[in-house]
Amino acid sequence: MVSKKWLALSAAVLMGLAPVSFASAADETPSAAQVFKTTAAFVQTASKTDKADSKETAKAPLTAESIKVNPAKWNYDEKNDIYYQIGLVYCTKPAATEYEQLAVYVPGAYMKGTKNQDGTYTAVINDKAKVGNYTAKTAPIVMPVNTGGYAAQKAPSAYYPNGLNTYLSEGFVYVFAGCRGRENGTNPDGTEFVGGAPWGVTDLKAAVCYLRYNDSLIPGSKNRIFTFGHSGGGAQSALMGATGDSDFFGPYLSSIGALMTDAKGKPLSDAIDGAQAWCPITNLTQADFSYEWMMGQYANDCERAYGTWTRAISQDMARNYAAYLNNMQLKDENGNLLTLSQGWDGNGINASGTYYDYMRGVIETSLNHFLSDNKFPLTLGGSDFHMDGGFPGQGPQQRPTSMVPGGKPFPKDTPTEPHTYQTPQDYIDSLNGDDPWITYDAKTNTAKITSIGAFTSRLKKASKGIGAFDSTTLSQAENLLFGNGKVSAMHFDGGMSWLMEHNKDRYSAYADYNDNIRKSYYDEMDNVDSLGVPSIIRQIMYDPMTFILVPNDEEKPSVLANHWRINTGLFQGDTALNTELNLYLGLKQRKDVKNVLFTTVWNQKHTMAELTGNSTGNFIAWVKEVTAKE
């Protein structure tokens, strides 16, 4: 067995977690396949030998048969023509009893039911009925992931029909699965459970296995499972799409008694068919650095104020991002390599190269869609910020809290006074102000921007401090995500820690330098979770790019979803555009992915952003479109 140091270093080299100078210190640079095999083997071994910080209490295990769907326990809502079951425990050793359950909602036509004396129904699948374009065998199964900020998603405990028929009337089966979130927690009986990565996705995978175990009892095609979510929910939807059947998750699934085989012992897949992600907060192995490259380097207030050591590390992070990005070997739709040129020019740090030009083109395309999709005169104003309002199936008390670890609400934008722009030129003039950065051609109704920095410094300003996701104050939701059973919030960004160690003398020359911050990062880099798995490996497990950026000719570590839809509000300060853009580019390079839609929406922020229409209708239309082609 190789050392933890080799594992961490190999992962850093593979994902760009360390600068090139650090990577060159390795005895050998492993291939992607080598790293996956070695780290997966480590997870398997560690989970059997080290459970030092587990908070879970041993319970008498349930059995697959005892949690199987009971066909005599269906409920029927005659008014809305919905069959449903709530409180279905989907694993035999649940750690979080209020979360590791699911509810299933089925169009009435898909079932034949007989009413029981207690008011429930004994029902079987009706294979002949059709709703829309689907039958009970071909219907897509859609699963919401309403976990903003990587919060927990409590399983439905009561029946709330509002909004369900929006999906069911199209012939979909709607499954609402609970899952653990970023924090440790306590069950109603007083026992404690561990949260954080990778338990949320582990729970959702167990729910998918449960659906397949009950294939003959629950309507819907188990080959057409789609997840959808926003923000941290969008991230976990993307993870569900990227990590299908990954060996990394095996020990975690086993620990909760997931139904990984059918009644005959045949393996059950946890892979899904499609993933919808709005503004996914993901790629956390690189997100702090990409944030400083795209946004932080153009800010000069608060922690990025001139003369502070935190500004110095911000600039260093922006500088080092080029090596990270170039290591990914991303290509455009024509197969051209996308890279950043290293160094300073008039537009900023590493603000040139084919990747830079591609991103600038994406921003311009978004602006031009806005100009063509909207009619002038156009009135804009108000707030563009919307938290998840809860997907159908949840009661108000079950929706995830919109709180950061310190107990303060996530920041919201101050509404602006509505203003009417008479023409596109009026709108462009308002954006340009006294320092023009957009050129507009009225004849073609198209515009171009001078630089990414000009855009971000005006419309996509940094709204987070240094360590946008691994905060120096441990105040971000992601600090909780990579905590463990002993400590709730912990540092995890090895790249930031490396910079603090190797630039200590330079940083300490600043008057505001605090060496305790450096020490706290260093001390927490080697923490392990309740299965003995190091933080660095859990970060890799919770980064979809880990599983996507594998050459087509190498052995794959997972089964990717066939269909992807990625939308983002271009003005959000929550994450850099690199997050969604790199996800799209990586997926486009994979031959085993059937289609990827990527949309950036001008004038929208951290929302379920859409060019036109609404998120629910567009998601449903997309699922119908891609399944019609299968």
Residue ranges and their predicted role:
Residues 189, 379-629:
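C-terminal subdomain of alpha/beta-hydrolase-fold enzymes, centered on the catalytic histidine
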Residues 213-296, 388-390, 395-400, 404-409:
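Primarily recognizes the serine-hydrolase "nucleophile elbow" in alpha/beta-hydrolase
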